[in-house]
């Protein structure tokens, strides 16, 4: 049974083995498309090189902020700042924060909801009924964390940080 050996993988092992399923392609891609030149204020058609997975990771973090805006009827997360450079992506919002306490549905759990959201697949607030969310699978931030060499998460729920 060597070639067809039955295996059970952890969530993280599966994400690493099949990244395309979670965050898209991990290889450099080349596409012809319209490009905006900020200095001239004009568009030109040219070749863009990028890694789709990097775009998806940025999108996952931005989507979390947008979900807070939707959840609060656009009273919170009204300002979403995104900073991207050659080695990092930073997303900051003025939202409500992820609770800095253990989840109520898991007695005995000592990790905060924030830590769980950033480190555990299939966790979050997107599993209730009548949810209008962009993120629905509970894998976004935790997948970004899996592929990050450094992941810093900060949350302030109004009581704790």
Regions found by a protein language model. Name each.
Residues 49-80, 140-147:
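Conserved ATP-binding N-box helix of the HATPase_c
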Residues 83-85:
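Structural motif
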Residues 19, 95, 121:
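Short, small-residue-rich loop/turn micro-motifs
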């Amino acid at each position: 049974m060597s070639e067809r050996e039955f295996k059970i993988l952890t969530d993280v092992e599966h994400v690493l083995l099949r990244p395309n399923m979670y965050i898209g392609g991990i290889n450099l891609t080349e596409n012809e498309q319209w490009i905006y030149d900020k200095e001239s204020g004009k568009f030109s058609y040219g070749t863009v090189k990028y890694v789709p997975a990097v775009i998806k990771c940025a999108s996952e973090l931005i989507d979390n902020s947008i979900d807070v805006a939707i959840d609060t009827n656009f009273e919170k997360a009204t300002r979403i700042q995104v900073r991207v450079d050659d080695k990092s992506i930073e997303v900051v919002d003025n939202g409500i924060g992820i609770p800095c306490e253990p989840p109520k549905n898991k007695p005995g759990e000592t990790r905060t909801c924030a830590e769980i959201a950033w480190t555990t697949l299939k966790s979050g607030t997107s599993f209730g009924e009548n949810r209008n969310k962009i993120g629905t699978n509970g894998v976004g931030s935790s997948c970004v964390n899996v592929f990050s060499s450094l992941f810093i998460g900060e949350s302030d729920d109004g009581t704790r940080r």
